[in-house]
Amino acid sequence: VGMIAMMSMRPGIAIPAFQEAERLLASECRGTEWERMMARHFACYAQVASGDLDAGRRGAAQHVDEARRHNDTFALGMFMTTPRAWHWILEDDPAKAGPDFDEALRGWPTDEYYMVHHFEALSRGTVSLYQQRNEEALGIFLTMGQKLRAAMLTSLQALFAEYLFWLSRAAIRAGDVATAKRAARSLRRIKLRICEGYLEGLRGLEANRRGDGAAAERHLARAMEMCDEADFPLYGVGYRYRLGQQLGGASGERLIHQARDWLTRQGAKNPDRVLDMMAPGFDGVASQRLLP
């Protein structure tokens, strides 16, 4: 149930399923340490995806300590990547993430592309984007794309969609409109609710670029709703922030405050920086379209 929900990008359903799986494996089965570790990892991963960032990072920290005690290279590699990366983003201390990523890859072959390599690259690119090292982040994600295709992992639509979200954000930040368009074109072919919500957000950002305030408000409001409905409030809160900026005045300030408050309650020390990363594009060139 948990994996079906994850592959459908419904983290709200996946979280309790993975937690129950871990409980059953611990109480009813023997010799299932690997399966329990994977259930724990995907529960933390789904918590981050769903926007329960603080729970995801606290769970990852606990499992990192356990992996170190047991000298578990596989578990350490998994937990030191995506769940752990968000700890340093929330702490607004991204420079400390690099040693974690290096530790995650220690002992793994360098000429293969396993899941730990995927999660490490995704995490490293996300942290670079948070640091506003936009071209560096874009380079990481473009290299990831080549490896995903070589490993034939693009057929896993949830994994590929998440990659495309981050590729798109990095391309927008770096001013690579052609890559942003290619990412949007690929997302259109993935029929998942969160993909539709993300694309609706791009329509809002594009409308803002061309000065069409009414369209920007309409698309951003719809994107916010669609992302929340898809169990991705972390994406929705970015569009809430941008909608507030678009509206201005007292109503806009209220939305901006709500977005900041939501992230602050998740432990974010610099919520505006997270929000700008999640929904970039308001400072783009009006003549350049984001969508194909």
Describe the residue ranges of each PLM region.
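Active-site cavity-forming subdomains of large catalytic enzyme subunits
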Residues: V1-L25
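Acidic/serine-rich, low-complexity amphipathic helices located in mid- to C-terminal regulatory regions
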Residues: M3-M9, H41, Y45-G51
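Short, amphipathic alpha-helical segments
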Residues: S8-I15, R30-E33, S50, D54
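Active-site/ligand-binding-proximal alpha/beta "capping" segment
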Residues: F18, E33, A43
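Helix-coil-helix junctions within alpha-helical repeat/solenoid scaffolds
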Residues: Q19-E22, Y45-P292
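Aromatic- and glycine-enriched pocket-lining scaffold segments that form the walls
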Residues: R36-M38
